[in-house]
Structure formats: structure tokens, C-alpha cells
A protein has these predicted regions:
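Signature of N-terminal electron-transfer/Fe-S-associated modules in redox systems
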Residues: 1-152
């Protein structure tokens, strides 16, 4: 089947198999930030933004993205660069959390801790738990608020 998908701002027109996963399509096109983890849509490593909404690309057929816009971390480096260091400073892994954090901050630039946890709930973190990510995002938001107030 023929599809047209805008990936990180670039239109890709291609013939694909109807059972091709979005994850495999994206990796074929150089989006290596999209990881294959559990393959059961439980871990969140494969999270991408489909028309701005986080989806698990290991459970989305490429055909579903036909006519839509997909963003991976490769296309959102500038937006992510503000807060990933804050997450890393907490010793927390960033696997899949970055895409959900971008979606959260676009929707709600001043989320509560419960709202942050709700957005991160789609990611399974066996390495560092969720508290490091929460602290990193909270520290980033505190930094941004201090900057806005001219205290940074």
C-alpha cells in the first residue's frame, strides 16, 4: 500500500506492507531514538508523537499514520534540550520519558506532580523508578519559573 507520512517535518511517500509497524518504518528512515523494548506496548521505549499525541509505535501499524505527522526525538532535539539535563542530573534514565514530557509541557506548562506522574505512567522504568524523572522535570519547571521572574 502507498502511504504519505510527514516524519520530523519531512514528507515520506513510500509503498509499505500493510502489516509494517510504525516503529520499523521510523527506524528504517533513520529515527534510531525509537527503541524496540518489550514489543507488547508496555514499556514506552517506542513512544513517538502522532499529530502531537504520544503513541507506542510498536503497536501502531504504519498505515494508521498515513496522512499524519510523526515526530521522534530526532525532530525535537531543540525542544527536549531544555529539560533532559535536569532528568540526567537526577540519575534518571530518559528512555521514552522525553516524548511524554514534551507532550505534557505542550499541553500544560505548569503541571502538578500528580499530572507529571500521570503522563509518565505509560513508561515502564525498571532501572531508576519514576522519582528521578519527576524530580528532574520539577527542577526544570522551577528553573523556568525562576527565569521568568528574573531570578536566574
Amino acid at each position: 500500500m502507498d502511504i504519505k507520512i510527514k516524519v520530523n517535518g519531512t514528507l515520506i511517500c513510500e509503498s509499505v506492507s500493510p502489516d509494517l509497524l510504525l516503529l520499523d518504518f521510523l527506524r528504517k528512515h533513520g529515527c534510531y531514538s525509537v527503541k524496540r523494548g518489550c514489543e507488547t506496548a508496555n514499556c514506552g521505549l517506542c513512544t513517538v508523537l502522532l499529530d502531537g499525541t504520544p503513541v507506542l509505535s510498536c503497536s501502531v501499524l504504519c498505515a494508521r499514520a498515513d496522512g499524519h505527522e510523526v515526530y521522534t526525538l530526532e525532530g525535537l532535539q531543540e525542544e527536549a534540550s531544555g529539560f533532559v539535563g535536569f532528568i540526567a542530573d537526577q540519575g534518571a534514565d530518559q528512555c521514552g520519558f522525553v516524548m511524554n514530557t514534551i507532550a505534557l509541557l505542550r499541553e500544560n506548562p505548569d503541571p502538578s506532580d500528580d499530572e507529571i506522574r500521570a503522563y509518565l505512567a505509560g513508561n515502564l522504568c525498571r532501572c531508576s523508578g519514576y522519582e528521578g524523572q519527576l524530580r528532574g522535570i520539577r527542577n526544570y519547571l522551577d528553573y523556568i519559573n525562576r527565569k521568568k521572574q528574573g531570578k536566574e
